[in-house]
Amino acid sequence: MPKLEMMLLVLLILPLCYIDAVGPLPPWNMEDEIIEHWQKLHCYEISDLTPWILCSPEPLCGGKGCCAQEVCDCSGPACTCPPCL
């Protein structure tokens, strides 16, 4: 097979991995994956009842539900973090 025909065949097949049965796949968001990986390394869950709130032993602020352990308020059914200053 000549090189031109081979290249056209590859260019025809290549986009198929980006198309799902229901349409184009959503774009990959690296920022969310980086934040999730960082939270797994630096934060931990306060209780099984509130897996959506994370507190950190380090003084952090504004990291998608991650705040310093000493300012996490877990008195009651849910944990909350104060707003960042």
From Swiss-Prot:
GO molecular function: toxin activity
Protein task: Probable neurotoxin.
This protein's name: Conotoxin Lt28.3
Family statement: Belongs to the conotoxin D superfamily.
Endpoints of the signal sequence: 1-21
Species of origin: Conus litteratus
Subcellular localization, as worded in the UniProt entry: Secreted
Top-rank lineage group of the source organism: Eukaryota
